[in-house]
């Protein structure tokens, strides 16, 4: 339960400075608060915050990011079908407004992880390959994040019993 306090409260000001410096310094306001709640395991409250922000938001990229955050929270709750629905909403926006390719790759990766979890290797592979396509555009060829994507693709091929293809990615 949240309680309204005065902005002049000394402890609150100290906490605010600490939070701003240590947690998501690139974020502001309610979005940052939602991320902190999620990090603290208060996933339901984080979802509530993200939904409120989503209702007020007009920027398409930010809406896509918010859908992705709600999807991640749903995945934290093991509500994977709901998570995928929110990730897909994020993707719809990201594909129409591709100025945030990094966010789109993250969302594809989130879906791939869910399919990995359920050993749905065909779908996982599809999304890992989408991540790879974007990451190759954004990252240098020796970036460790690319290695992770290649490994994930190899694991998907391994799950499909396509060992020769799996070896090419490991």
Model-derived segments and their meaning:
Residues 48, 52-69, 99:
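Short, charge-rich amphipathic alpha-helical segments embedded
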Residues 1-29, 37-45, 55-57:
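Long, contiguous interaction/recruitment modules in multidomain scaffold/adaptor proteins
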Residues 22, 58-59, 97-100, 139-142:
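Short coil/turn linker motifs that delimit alpha-helical repeat modules in TPR/alpha-solenoid proteins
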Residues 31-39, 62-76, 102-117, 144-159:
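Conserved alpha-helical positions within TPR/SEL1-like repeat arrays
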Residues 52-55, 89-99, 132-137:
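Amphipathic alpha-helical segments of tetratricopeptide repeats
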């Amino acid at each position: 339960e949240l309680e309204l306090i005065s902005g002049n409260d000394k402890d609150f000001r100290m906490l605010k400075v600490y939070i701003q410096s240590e947690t998501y310094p690139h974020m502001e306001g309610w979005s940052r608060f939602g991320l902190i709640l999620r990090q603290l395991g208060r996933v339901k409250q984080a979802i509530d915050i993200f939904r409120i922000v989503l209702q007020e938001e007009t920027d398409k990229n930010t809406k896509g990011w918010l859908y992705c955050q709600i999807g991640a929270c749903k995945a934290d709750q093991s509500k994977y079908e709901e998570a995928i629905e929110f990730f897909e909403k994020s993707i719809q926006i990201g594909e129409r407004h591709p100025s945030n390719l990094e966010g789109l790759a993250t969302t594809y990766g989130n879906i791939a992880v869910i399919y990995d979890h359920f050993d749905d290797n065909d779908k996982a592979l599809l999304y890992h390959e989408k991540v790879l396509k974007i990451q190759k555009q954004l990252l240098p060829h020796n970036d460790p994040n690319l290695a992770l994507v290649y490994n994930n693709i190899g694991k998907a091929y391994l799950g499909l019993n396509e060992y020769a293809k799996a070896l090419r990615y490991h």
